[in-house]
């Protein structure tokens, strides 16, 4: 399992008492008196001895990639002269440092000591330990590609500023071809084959992926979305088109832009995108729910507003506000056509913090109003909500807003009583996972992130479990091909579940196991997967490039 790390720094300022000056005055008086008794030639207390010089460097230790730079700072006390000189203790082979304290690491892994020395008192110095990281290359251990199709490989190179790799196929031309950009073209038969990425900075470091050829895989579309976006929604309409709405725009340099109100339609027949809408409000982290009358309810996005899209007119119409503002919530279509909206987070003073809520409400399409129902047992955001075959709703996991950060809590909502009851806890706290109701009524819960904000620790799950409503229990863990969170899970027409991150797996309920399938060509940090009427799956988000799994 891969690890997510966080680092915190606390800086404290302390006020020093001025009583030291009074003590010095008494000392000077005593010296004068003793001097007078001894018949000295002066009654002057004399000049106080200068304070000793000390030098410190910040930070005292750090890690740096090969060839990268790092800025150090120095502090000198006990003397008005703050001038210092910088040096590398191990010499030129261990890197260099400028007079301003900017260190540049060598192209080799090692431990280095950066030394700062006082100009006023060269006998005073301090040093910082620099760990120059070793180069590493990583690829998925196993990847899938379609027979005769293409597959984009992305190698992760760490420990150096040089991220370039050289690609090769262990089996030579019989195993296909691969470009300098990592685009693999598979043969029409055979396999598995082995694709290797070797670091340009350190050719001794490489990684190899076993490529399994399958009948299914991803294909990039010739047309792109009208606006690159993420944190949007993508909803299959009764006419077979897909409504893509809102989200956060992506700038030309790949950075995040602004919340958008724009919307567009994807037509599977022509595989093109056309404008519709826009929404009445810009929003991201919202939820779109297809109602029984064919319209789409759009709720939240860290606000309390809601609106309905009508495919017949191509327009959005605001409806009554929700009881509470929320984003990263869930919205579940109940058997009677109403919508359960649960949990999520609201805005707070810290834009980067999560403020989960436990409140829940129901939207009634006939009155276009929201009514509060019983709260969930726990606050939750980025959780999941799965409608079970008998009509109840399983709510699981999510960010809790308190230690440890993620939770293993689960709850069951009963539409008849409009209330939640505690459910069987997940086998491991998690958020940003997926939960998919299978055709047999069980629920596949896959991946997710565990975060312990109190101990600054966390990891990503590479396993999945199956919840059985009949017994309120979970199956043993099933291994996926990679750790995943913020991924997608889509129920296919044949009853299998397509789980996609940087690679793709198919979960077979009959065997309760995962098998590799052709993977995506685009590396998406945030994606929306929409099953089309013909069984294919549309992928959008993080870029204007769209793909179809078929």
Annotate the PLM regions.
Residues 58-79, 139-161:
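Solvent-exposed, low-complexity, repeat-rich "mucin-like" stalks and linkers
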Residues 109-121, 190-202:
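A short beta-strand micro-motif common to beta-rich folds, especially ectodomain repeats
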Residues 101-108, 182-190:
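Solvent-exposed segments in extracellular or luminal domains encompassing
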Residues 152, 214-550:
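Kelch-like beta-propeller repeat domains
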Residues 4-24:
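Bacterial N-terminal signal peptides that target proteins for export
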Residues 26-56, 122, 129, 203, ...:
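Bacterial Sec-dependent N-terminal signal peptides
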Residues 51-53, 132-137, 213-217:
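Extracellular interdomain linker/stem segments of modular secreted and single-pass surface proteins
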Residues 87-102, 168-183:
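Low-complexity "stalk/linker" and mucin-like segments enriched in Ser/Thr/Pro/Ala/Gly
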């Amino acid at each position: 399992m891969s690890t997510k790390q966080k680092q915190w720094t606390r800086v404290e300022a302390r006020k020093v008492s001025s009583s030291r000056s009074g003590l010095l005055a008494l000392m000077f008086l005593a010296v004068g008196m003793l001097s007078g008794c001894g018949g000295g030639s002066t009654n002057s207390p004399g000049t106080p001895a200068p304070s000793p010089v000390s030098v410190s460097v910040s930070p005292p230790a750090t890690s740096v990639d090969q060839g990268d730079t790092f800025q150090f700072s120095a502090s000198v006390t006990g003397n008005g002269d703050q001038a210092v000189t910088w040096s590398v203790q191990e010499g030129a082979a261990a890197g260099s440092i400028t007079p301003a304290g900017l260190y540049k690491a060598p192209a080799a892994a090692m431990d280095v000591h950066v030394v700062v020395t006082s100009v006023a008192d060269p006998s005073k110095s301090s040093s910082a330990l620099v760990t120059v990281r070793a180069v590493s290359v990583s690829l998925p251990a196993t990847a899938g590609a379609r027979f005769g199709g293409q597959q984009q490989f992305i190698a992760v190179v760490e420990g150096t500023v040089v991220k370039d790799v050289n690609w090769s196929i262990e089996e030579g031309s019989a195993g296909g071809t691969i470009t300098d950009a990592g685009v693999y073209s598979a043969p029409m038969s055979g396999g598995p084959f082995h694709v290797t990425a070797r670091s340009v900075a350190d050719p001794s470091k490489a990684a190899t992926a076993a490529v399994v050829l399958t009948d299914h895989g991803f294909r990039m579309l010739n047309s792109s979305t009208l606006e690159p976006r993420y944190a949007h929604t993508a909803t299959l309409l009764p006419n077979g088109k897909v409504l893509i709405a809102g989200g956060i725009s992506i700038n030309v340099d790949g950075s995040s832009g602004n919340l958008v109100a724009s919307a567009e339609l994807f037509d599977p027949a022509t595989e093109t995108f056309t404008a519709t809408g826009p929404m009445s409000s810009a929003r991201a982290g919202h939820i779109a729910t297809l109602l029984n009358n064919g319209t789409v309810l759009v709720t939240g996005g860290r606000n309390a507003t809601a609106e309905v899209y009508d495919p017949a007119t191509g327009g959005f119409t605001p409806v009554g506000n929700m009881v509470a503002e929320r984003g990263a919530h869930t919205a579940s279509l109940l058997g009677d056509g109403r919508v359960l909206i649960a949990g999520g987070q609201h805005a707070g003073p810290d834009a980067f913090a999560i403020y989960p809520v436990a409140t829940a409400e129901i939207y009634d399409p006939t009155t276009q109003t929201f009514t509060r129902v019983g709260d969930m047992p726990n606050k939750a955001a980025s959780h999941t909500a799965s409608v079970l075959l008998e009509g109840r709703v399983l709510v699981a996991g999510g960010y809790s807003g308190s230690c440890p950060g993620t939770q293993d809590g689960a709850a069951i909502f009963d539409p008849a009583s409009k209330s939640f009851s505690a459910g069987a806890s997940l086998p491991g706290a998690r958020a940003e996972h997926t939960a998919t109701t299978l055709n047999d009524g069980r629920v596949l819960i896959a991946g997710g992130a565990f975060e312990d904000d109190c101990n600054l620790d966390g990891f990503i799950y590479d396993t999945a479990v199956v919840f059985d409503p009949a017994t309120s229990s979970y199956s043993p863990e099933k291994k996926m091909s990679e750790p995943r969170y913020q991924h997608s899970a889509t129920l296919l027409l044949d009853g299998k579940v397509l789980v996609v991150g940087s690679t793709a797996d198919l979960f077979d309920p009959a065997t309760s196991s995962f098998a590799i399938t052709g993977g995506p060509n685009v590396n998406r940090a945030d994606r929306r997967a929409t099953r089309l009427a013909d069984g294919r799956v549309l992928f959008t988000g993080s870029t204007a490039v769209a793909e179809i799994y078929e």
